[in-house]
From Swiss-Prot:
It comes from Kluyveromyces marxianus (Yeast). Keywords: Phosphoprotein, Ribonucleoprotein, Ribosomal protein. Belongs to the eukaryotic ribosomal protein eS6 family. Phosphorylated. One of its GO terms (biological process) is translation. The modification Phosphoserine is found at S229, S230. This is Small ribosomal subunit protein eS6. Transmembrane segments: none annotated. GO terms for molecular function: structural constituent of ribosome. Pfam families: Ribosomal_S6e (PF01092). The lineage of its organism: Eukaryota, Fungi, Dikarya, Ascomycota, Saccharomycotina. The keyword Protease does not apply. SMART domains: Ribosomal_S6e.
Length: 235
């Protein structure tokens, strides 16, 4: 079985192949999300605590959280379900997935390091992979640099260098949820327009009610007139 060990703090991961079945038996009958002591896997993982994140069986079917079976099942899946990507709007499909309970039929098991041990794992804990892109949302940029609301976020956007041919230039992401005077003005304008439309609708409704009452009064008067003329004719 292969163990895909990842360390989110450093942004690294590594695939370790373990041929001895006795070493991976500690994972059997455990579910996705459960934590396992790394010492049972080997002395090189002493002190480590792993969390089971998922895996694939020998035929390549992925493990699905919530399916409490050690076998493969066919589920009707829709948009928003893990292990399925719809090709058309509203499309649903019955697909085979592997249950969330670990068994000997798995080819790869994904593990996340929850607690680091004494020894370093080569290529996982001793290396750091920097993030390619910085934060994009205004609040996240403030958190990242410890800024206050008075500071201008646009000065702190992380720019990246792009080389196109011989020309090198910097590129910055569009800041999302950035509050600017233009945005506040647009909000005020939208609010004023909403109030204006509501007022116009109220006035139109009142005018229509007035016209309807007038028409009803005219109709009633006409009916009374006809009735009076018919009574005169009968006499």
């Amino acid at each position: 079985m292969k163990l895909n060990i990842s360390y989110p703090i450093n942004g690294t991961q590594k695939c370790v192949e373990i041929d001895d079945e006795h070493r991976v038996r500690v994972f059997y009958d455990k579910r996705i999300g459960q934590e396992v002591d790394g010492e049972a896997v080997g002395d090189e993982f002493k002190g480590y605590v792993f969390k089971i994140a998922g895996g694939n069986d020998k035929q390549g079917f992925p493990m699905k959280q919530g399916v409490l079976l050690p076998t493969r099942v066919k589920l009707l899946m829709a948009k928003g379900t893990s292990c399925y990507r719809p090709r058309r709007n509203g499309e649903r499909k019955r697909k085979s997935v592997r249950g969330a309970i670990v068994g000997p039929d798995l080819a790869v098991l994904a593990l996340v390091i929850v607690k680091k041990g004494d020894q370093e794992i080569e290529g996982v804990t001793n290396e750091t992979v920097p993030k390619r892109l910085g934060p994009k949302r205004a609040n996240n940029i403030r958190k990242f640099f410890g800024l206050t609301k008075e500071d201008d976020v646009r000065d702190y956007v992380i720019r990246r260098e792009v080389t196109k041919g011989e020309k090198t230039y910097t590129k910055a992401p569009k800041i999302q949820r950035l509050v600017t005077p233009q945005r506040l003005q647009r909000k005020r304008q939208q609010k004023a327009l909403k109030i204006k439309n509501a007022q116009a609708q109220r006035e139109a409704a009142a005018e229509y009610a007035q016209l309807l009452a007038k028409r009803l009064a005219e109709r009633k008067a006409e009916v009374r007139k006809r009735r009076a003329s018919s009574l005169k004719a009968a006499e």
